[in-house]
UniProtKB/Swiss-Prot annotation:
Name of this chain's protein: Sulfurtransferase TusE
One biological process term in Gene Ontology: tRNA wobble position uridine thiolation
Gene: tusE
Swiss-Prot/TrEMBL keywords: Cytoplasm, Transferase, tRNA processing
Organism: Salmonella typhimurium (strain LT2 / SGSC1412 / ATCC 700720)
Enzyme class: transferase
């Protein structure tokens, strides 16, 4: 659990939101700060993309799926592991989904 703007936000033991409806962009900034990330325009592009992916497919993308989907939408320059790890060094699928207020991807350790 975390406290944000005076409200209790329910999280699992790793800090992923239990209720995706509690997410907001302001909360994303706070979660990112806890992860040691200051959100840039590039980060937001990935975070929003991951949320759209979740809403469409009802699952958080694991890294391979994320890379492939990013490449399809944004091209090879952004749809590759190196680019995504530069933005999310502890794991793009893990950190991007956590910041996006989504459940941990199933295939993440």
């Amino acid at each position: 659990m975390l406290i944000f703007e005076g409200k209790e936000i329910s999280t699992d033991s790793e800090g992923y939101l239990k209720e995706t409806t509690q997410w907001s962009e302001a909360l994303a900034v706070a979660i990112a700060a806890n992860e040691g990330i200051e959100l840039s325009a590039e980060h937001w592009e990935v975070v929003r993309f991951v949320r759209e992916f979740y809403l469409e497919f009802n699952t958080s993308p694991a890294i391979r799926m994320l890379v492939k989907a990013m490449a399809n939408k944004f091209g090879e320059e952004k749809g590759n592991s190196r680019y995504l790890y530069r933005l999310f060094p502890k794991g793009p699928a893990k950190q991007a989904t956590k910041i996006a207020g989504l459940p941990k991807p199933v295939k993440c350790i």
